[in-house]
Amino acid sequence: ETSLQQWRFSHDKLREQALHSLSSEERIELHACIAQSIEKIYPGDAGRASQLALHYREAQQLTKAAHFYGEAGEVALRRGAPGEAAVLLEQARTLHSQVAQPRLAEIRVWRGLTEANFGLGRLREAESALRHLCMLGGIPLPTQSAHLLSMIARVGASLMGSRVGLF
């Protein structure tokens, strides 16, 4: 249906068909336009970060997509959704390997991956992310498992304590 020169799709299949009828260049341009519109209408709204990430990725603007996937992952962590955060931060990490990003952005992604994996009980993945994070920060980690697990537990307790307002 149309209203004031705008399309509104009442069924997913109609929307999918309309998207498939576009050329790849038109889809890229449409996604870029949508992302720019979201940023203009909702400036600084971190709750829109996952939408922006998706549209910038589809618009092949990978630097912006990586930024917004990282931001969306941090938002998910703050909401207490480590599973969602892990998926979003993994997208950011993948894009960081394709486009140059500031070291601080990489550190934030790896910190988030450490926290998300720890929150999900994925201790091996949390350890791996923590090792990478510390490597980026120039801080060596202990190599013995007992010392490392103790360190991870302390960091995890500190993170959880800060979430509930104990620290």
Would you name each region that the model predicts?
Residues 1-84, 94-96, 136, 140, ...:
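Short secondary-structure boundary elements
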Residues 74-97, 107-117, 121-122:
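N-terminal alpha-helical targeting/anchoring segments
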